[in-house]
Amino acid sequence: ITIIERAEGNYLIDSKGRKVIDGLSGLFAVNIGHGRKELADAAQAQTLQLDYFPLWSYAHPKAIELAERLISIAPSGMTRIFFTTGGGDAVESAWKIAKQYFKMTGKPLKTKVISRQTDYHGTSHGALSITGIAAFKQMFEPLVPSTFRIPNNNWYRAGSEFKTEDDFAIWAANRLEEAILFEGPDTVAAFF
């Protein structure tokens, strides 16, 4: 097994000193690079002041500051922020918010989720149900019902049957529309 000892910028360095590009950005969590001193300093300062506190019925200055910054760059009309602890938790929360919204607006049958083949959404039970990578899911099936997949929309995977990227984009959008119509527009809550 390869042992990764450290990282610098976009590189991982193994126990033999070999450098490789971190193509997954630390599983999508290190998208600005490893070993950033300014981030370590900010994390240390915040940890010494308030390392963790749940936001259930409470707030703290840094959460308020971040929420205000996000709202300032969000599309018009978006005025609320919901913080989660990570990617899979964010997916689970978004799915639950969609289901709750439709129940509260008199559409309780809108519970189904459509996602793309080969998409990765996390390893928690619900997020894994939406994930489109069969090898990740097989040992845990059956998973949450009411999840459906459509073809991936990456142009580089399209093959030669499409003359232009626009042709492929229209084809991919049509697959989503077909899935919604097949499952029933009154039953689909979200598309991931």
Report residues per predicted region.
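Short helix-terminating capping/connector loops at secondary-structure junctions
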Residues: 77, 105-110, 143, 185-187
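PLP-dependent aminotransferase-class I/II
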Residues: 117-192
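Glycine-rich loop-to-alpha-helix module at the N-terminal edge of alpha/beta enzyme cores
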Residues: 19-107, 114
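A residue-level signal for beta-strand positions that form part of recognition/binding surfaces
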Residues: 9, 20, 146-147
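Residue-level recognition of short loop/turn positions
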Residues: 15-16
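Short, small/polar residue-rich loop motifs at catalytic or cofactor-binding pockets
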Residues: 4-8
